[in-house]
Amino acid sequence: MQQRRPIRRALLSVSDKAGIVEFAQALSHRGVELLSTGGTARLLADAGLAVTEVSDYTGFPEMMDGRVKTLHPKVHGGILGRRDQDDAIMTQHDIKPIDIVVVNLYPFAQTVARENCTLEDAVENIDIGGPTMVRSAAKNHKDVAIVVKSSDYTTIINEIDANEGSLTYETRFDLAIKAFEHTAAYDSMIANYFGALVPPYHGDTDKPSGHFPRTLNLNYIKKQDMRYGENSHQQAAFYIEENIHEASVATSTQLQGKALSYNNIADTDAALECVKEFAEPACVIVKHANPCGVAIGGSILDAYDRAYKTDPTSAFGGIIAFNRELDEETAQAIISRQFVEVIIAPSASDAALKVTAAKQNVRVLTSGSWQQRVPALDFKRVNGGLLVQDRDLGMVDTSQLRVVTERQPSEQELRDALFCWKVAKFVKSNAIVYARDNMTIGIGAGQMSRVYSAKIAGIKAADEGLEVKGSAMASDAFFPFRDGIDAAAAVGISCVIQPGGSIRDDEVIAAANEHGIAMIFTDMRHFRH
């Protein structure tokens, strides 16, 4: 099975023509005969290459507006023919062996992503001949190489040169795996698109759910294996989407430090997604997927100083995210002040990297800049199933807020309320966030009762000597009882922001009025589990 196969004849038919002329030139210069179709053949001919149209080779014209081009025995016989046992029948029918197939498929994903895409547009961008050739070549990888990625062009030419015009079995097998992955992803996209057009019904209503396909097909690419998972007895790997349109931990570049662990990646994602909510220079410090300090400042150093003050104990061994370039002064403050697992920012200055280099184990990542948040799906696995929902991109502005108490919030209270509301979205439920002057001063996370999250936020603030009086409090969901408001009043909270929607809203509002607290309803919940 280690046999090399000489490359004498190539079939090229691509939708994405990036690099194809140069690749075809390299093959031709090495004596490889070129077969091609339609637009690819014209492009190669215009580049001065000797190329045979598939229709001339088969003696059968392209037809039906190009729907039928390569679906012919002389094409697939040349691809599927087994060199050690089908030679006679191939000779009998004048079928020439094809040694390498270079194909990429109609741009279905790009087509259906367009706002004005019609069903007819989608249908016409379903490739038939391409996947058929890809699968044929991948099946017969013992004799044929299949290329579906332009990123492999240079590697293939280099190996042909290194192996006297041949490709090894190991390379052909690896290319076949990529090919099957490619067609699986392509068919999944089509199935997901069409499945979402069928009106499935749910529960006891007759309203079609739409939006989600009947069968969900997911394709992710392995970026790296992990030493272990959440715990040392669990194996793990990190998979990413093939086409990511937003700066994220998945697209980040690691500039220094040890390999990222499973928990590092999860926590870094939590920190980065939180810091993206802020337009001003901001810092988010995360521990165990929960923010333990968040602040806005005049600079990222100022923001870091303020975020760190929220909870220095929890910040130890944490993840730090910024929404501005990491500079030398901020890097020095972090390295001299605390043990940190990961620092992530859109970019990092050379001077900052010289500082962090003194701590070689510290992982420094750059995410690139972000312009907007991209709608996507969130997944949560349960035993035997998968919960799927839209990504929570909801956020309110001042025009959407409802003040429900007798007292109106001051301008400062309103700013603090909106700040801690943004933070609460990223704290595990039940989530309570205390904030003042664009800085968290206490965070209560993940408690089974909301009132205890409120109490913990107060305890955290007291432990660090942070003044709560006159601060704002955010709750990710409504208060089911007045006790959360009473607990907030006891430590000096003057403004509360929450979704509202409890059957006891009147009691909760009355409690706020009793304590002279301004209360704002957002009419939007941010559970996080």
From Swiss-Prot:
It catalyses: (6R)-10-formyltetrahydrofolate + 5-amino-1-(5-phospho-beta-D-ribosyl)imidazole-4-carboxamide = 5-formamido-1-(5-phospho-D-ribosyl)imidazole-4-carboxamide + (6S)-5,6,7,8-tetrahydrofolate; IMP + H2O = 5-formamido-1-(5-phospho-D-ribosyl)imidazole-4-carboxamide. Pathway: Purine metabolism; IMP biosynthesis via de novo pathway; 5-formamido-1-(5-phospho-D-ribosyl)imidazole-4-carboxamide from 5-amino-1-(5-phospho-D-ribosyl)imidazole-4-carboxamide (10-formyl THF route): step 1/1; Purine metabolism; IMP biosynthesis via de novo pathway; IMP from 5-formamido-1-(5-phospho-D-ribosyl)imidazole-4-carboxamide: step 1/1. Keywords: Hydrolase, Multifunctional enzyme, Purine biosynthesis, Transferase. GO terms for biological process: 'de novo' IMP biosynthetic process. Residues 1-148 form the MGS-like domain. Signal peptide: none annotated. GO terms for cellular component: cytosol. Its EC number is 2.1.2.3, 3.5.4.10. The keyword Lyase does not apply. One of its GO terms (molecular function) is phosphoribosylaminoimidazolecarboxamide formyltransferase activity. Gene3D superfamilies: 3.40.140.20, Methylglyoxal synthase-like domain. SMART domains: AICARFT_IMPCHas, MGS. The IMP cyclohydrolase activity resides in the N-terminal region. Belongs to the PurH family. This is Bifunctional purine biosynthesis protein PurH. It comes from Pectobacterium atrosepticum (strain SCRI 1043 / ATCC BAA-672) (Erwinia carotovora subsp. atroseptica). The lineage of its organism: Bacteria, Pseudomonadati, Pseudomonadota, Gammaproteobacteria, Enterobacterales. The gene is purH.
